[in-house]
Amino acid sequence: MNQNWNAEKYTSDFSFVHNYGNDVLGLIDTTGVKDVLDLGCGNGALTNTLADKGFSVVGMDASEEMLEIARNNYPGISFIRSDAVDFALEKPVDVVFSNAVFHWIDKADQPRMLECVYRALKSGGQFVFEMGGIGNNILIHSALADLFREYGYTYKMPFYFPSVGEYAGMLEAVGFQVRFAVLFDRPTKLKGENGLSDWINMFV
């Protein structure tokens, strides 16, 4: 993945990330679902919501700083450290859930990650996730690229924002059947007069 996290600031100032993820939880078909993996669980907020719904849930993240917060806040939940592009479960699960994670993973690593997810699921299991898509924050990244160029530097885009068609093709190549996928606008109001600079410092 592309990011070293300030886990405490992320938790205190950017709660909108996991708050938006609550809507994604509603896409899970709960019929017969028992075991859930929250892939890229971060501070564990949505992992806890899944547990509150009665699922047996495990949170997985590559950031030890994030996992420390998750374990402190939700000691009754199992959290394990592993990279999304190279993980394996002892037993497959009914659902792999993920919120606001996959756009952090380089395009070249996406197929390997999706293969890990596919192997982690029981036959007929569900893969329910949200990620940034094509055009996301394009004005910010264009402005940063112009600014870097003005000073003689090249701006390296830190995210992978695919189209629905591109990503559906990746999923199908691994073996998934895509039942529902949508690209939508989601304006986010940032906090305070330094909201944009704080966002850039955290995520870029």
Name these PLM-found stretches.
Residues M1-K34, A45, T49, V128-E150:
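Conserved class I S-adenosyl-L-methionine
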Residues L37-L39, N43-D86:
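Class I SAM-dependent methyltransferase SAM/SAH-binding core
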Residues A88-V96:
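A short acidic, Gly/Pro-enriched loop at the edge of an enzyme's catalytic core
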Residues V95-D109:
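A short SAM/SAH-binding and catalytic strip from SAM-dependent methyltransferases
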Residues P111-Q126:
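A short glycine-rich, Lys/Arg-flanked "PGG" loop and its adjoining helix->strand segment in the class I
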Residues Y160-V174:
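Short alpha-helix
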Residues R179-V204:
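C-terminal helical/coil "lid" or tail adjacent to the Rossmann-like core of SAM-dependent
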